[in-house]
Amino acid sequence: MVIVPRVAIGVDTHAFESGRPCWVAGLHWPGQDGLAGHSDADVAAHAACNALLSAADLGDLGANFGVGQPEWSGASGVALLTESASRVRAAGYAIGNVSVQVIGNRPKIGSRRAEAQRVLSGAVGAPVSISAATTDGLGFPGRGEGLTGIAVALVYEAPDA
């Protein structure tokens, strides 16, 4: 049997919203402004969802958990990621890994990277790596207006599917 991998990229972007709790990479960041959105607006978890769903040809975050589905209003990124991984497996795919990069000035991911990787890997049921970058002051992330998450996911047909 030949295993044919499927790879997809996922992106998510949100603006900061004063007074909202900040959730990024499955972690709460006290003292930081949160991100505006239908759910917790966790750009890392949402980008991972988009990558996983796309790799399995299941659409995107909006099609699966969008504003037209009020039961997902306020949902945590970890809950959305857990459900996305479940849907990928139900479609007959196994998950190889996910890699996520958070782009923005804050919060500083590096000090909690291992913790974030544990949380997101637990949600996916497969390895998730996290990295971060700034834009050297360029664009909306550089101006401190919001964050972007970019992810890539590898899935393959499950041998017993």
From Swiss-Prot:
Protein name per the record: 2-C-methyl-D-erythritol 2,4-cyclodiphosphate synthase
Cofactor(s) named in the record: a divalent metal cation
Similarity-based family: Belongs to the IspF family.
Species the sequence originates in: Salinispora arenicola (strain CNS-205)
EC number: 4.6.1.12
HAMAP family xref list: IspF
Residue stretches spanning the membrane: none
Catalytic activity: 4-CDP-2-C-methyl-D-erythritol 2-phosphate = 2-C-methyl-D-erythritol 2,4-cyclic diphosphate + CMP
Gene of this entry: ispF
Positions in coiled-coil regions: none
Subunit annotation: Homotrimer.
Highest taxon of source: Bacteria
Binding site for 4-CDP-2-C-methyl-D-erythritol 2-phosphate: 12-14, 38-39, 60-62, 140, 143
Site (Transition state stabilizer): 38, 134
Cofactor remark from the record: Binds 1 divalent metal cation per subunit.
Pathway: Isoprenoid biosynthesis; isopentenyl diphosphate biosynthesis via DXP pathway; isopentenyl diphosphate from 1-deoxy-D-xylulose 5-phosphate: step 4/6
UniProt keyword annotations, A-Z: Isoprene biosynthesis, Lyase, Metal-binding
EC class of the enzyme, as a word: lyase
GO biological process per UniProt: isopentenyl diphosphate biosynthetic process, methylerythritol 4-phosphate pathway; terpenoid biosynthetic process
Residue positions binding a divalent metal cation: 12, 14, 46
